[in-house]
Amino acid sequence: MGIHGLAKLIADVAPAAIKEHDIKSYFGRKVAVDASMCIYQFLIAVRQDGNMLQNEEGETTSHLMGMFYRTIRMLEHGIKPVYVFDGKPPQMKSGELAKRSERRAEAEKLLEAAEEAGEVENIEKFNKRLVKVTKQHNEECKKLLSLMGIPYVDAPCEAEATCAALVKAGKVYAAATEDMDALTFGTPVLLRHLTASEAKKLPIQEFHLNRVFQDIGINHEQFVDLCILLGSDYCETIRGIGPKRAIDLIRQHKTIEEIIDNIDLKKYPIPENWLHKEARQLFLEPEVIDADITELKWTEPDEEGLVAFMCGEKQFSEDRIRNGAKKLAKNRQGSTQGRLDDFFKVTGSISSTKRKEVESKGSTKKKSKTGGTPAGKFKRGK
């Protein structure tokens, strides 16, 4: 779920904190990708006749197809992804997980009714609501990534928190996820829509946390309290306090405790046994890997291993998998070229007009030297 309404709130009150870019803008960048979010997207989107792709044994393969081709697409644009997998959910998330189970049970009933009535659109809609990322999905994707030569990290707890830790440690440029709570966990840069289907033609949204703080006039601790008021996975919120009211209260009173002391509790009743302090602690000091000592290595793909797994076990087209493996090897050879800003630190600023002129000249030179790389098409397997 992330944080209720946070993206819209930032767009309304701190629009300069959001930039929109094409995928080509991230050439040479290392990015920590929320693996569970990606796999969920693939299970929803990679379908044939409304159903998830399967092999002859009836095993789902949508997640593998999505992971294979979307990862290749990133590599073709010079992006070096590292995937971060969820660990155990925090105890505080048990309430949210219980609600999800209830919604899934309700969707099962609605699906059954839709099937009896022959309502094709509703059948597809409720089928998607039943999608859940399983341990098997995760393990198969880890095996695939290893064969592709792509690093992955097992987070001890929430993947978004470990993504944020990798960004803060300077191991990667940004965290890529649709969950806005990556910002609450403190990632300096968040990318949304990086792994979205090419067909959707969505620009990549880049959020800068320090600019959010600057434009709203709050610090990280106050931002965490704001997110708790908006609504998170970890505790209830105060009913009746919407996004604009929440931001005004945080600006005025700084903390949830001070807000409680200064609002009409009859009009805005506090949830019983409210765990806002525990939620704050979870966001400010999450359980994460030691990012400073974590080494990320991108290696040569194992073409024969990929064929054995994806074709021998999962029955994908051998021609397509071998073609993908060759793209992996080619992009591995070309991945040593980095970005200029990896070697030089910016000590001053230039005007937006001059910056555009510099970028324009740079892109012209790059095109004349290397030629354009065609965007990787998202292909169907099998």
Swiss-Prot record:
Organism per entry: Xenopus laevis
Function: Structure-specific nuclease with 5'-flap endonuclease and 5'-3' exonuclease activities involved in DNA replication and repair. During DNA replication, cleaves the 5'-overhanging flap structure that is generated by displacement synthesis when DNA polymerase encounters the 5'-end of a downstream Okazaki fragment. It enters the flap from the 5'-end and then tracks to cleave the flap base, leaving a nick for ligation. Also involved in the long patch base excision repair (LP-BER) pathway, by cleaving within the apurinic/apyrimidinic (AP) site-terminated flap.
Gene: fen1-b
Localization per Swiss-Prot or TrEMBL: Nucleus, Nucleolus; Nucleus, Nucleoplasm; Mitochondrion
Protein name: Flap endonuclease 1-B
Location of region: I-domain: 122-253
An example Gene Ontology molecular-function term: RNA-DNA hybrid ribonuclease activity
A Pfam family the protein falls into: XPG_I
Domain of life: Eukaryota
CC cofactor note: Binds 2 magnesium ions per subunit. They probably participate in the reaction catalyzed by the enzyme. May bind an additional third magnesium ion after substrate binding.
Cellular component GO terms, alphabetical: mitochondrion; nucleolus; nucleoplasm; nucleus
Residues that bind DNA: 47, 70, 158, 231, 233
CDD domains xrefs: H3TH_StructSpec-5'-nucleases (cd00080), PIN_FEN1 (cd09867)
PTM entry text: Phosphorylated. Phosphorylation upon DNA damage induces relocalization to the nuclear plasma.
Enzyme Commission (EC) number: 3.1.-.-
Keywords: DNA damage, DNA repair, DNA replication, Endonuclease, Exonuclease, Hydrolase, Magnesium, Metal-binding, Mitochondrion, Nuclease, Nucleus, Phosphoprotein
GO BP terms, alphabetized: base-excision repair; DNA replication; DNA replication, removal of RNA primer
Sequence segments annotated as region (Disordered): 352-382
InterPro entries xref list: 5-3_exonuclease_C_sf (IPR036279), Flap_endonuc (IPR023426), HhH2 (IPR008918), PIN-like_dom_sf (IPR029060), XPG-I_dom (IPR006086), XPG/Rad2 (IPR006084), XPG_CS (IPR019974), XPG_DNA_repair_N (IPR006085)
Family the entry assigns: Belongs to the XPG/RAD2 endonuclease family. FEN1 subfamily.
Location of region: N-domain: 1-104
Subunit structure: Interacts with PCNA. Three molecules of fen1 bind to one PCNA trimer with each molecule binding to one PCNA monomer. PCNA stimulates the nuclease activity without altering cleavage specificity.
SMART domains named among the record's database cross-references: HhH2, XPGI, XPGN
Cofactors that this protein relies on: Mg(2+)
Binding-site residues, Mg(2+) 1: 34, 86, 158, 160
Region (Interaction with PCNA): 336-344
PANTHER family: FLAP ENDONUCLEASE 1, FLAP ENDONUCLEASE FAMILY MEMBER
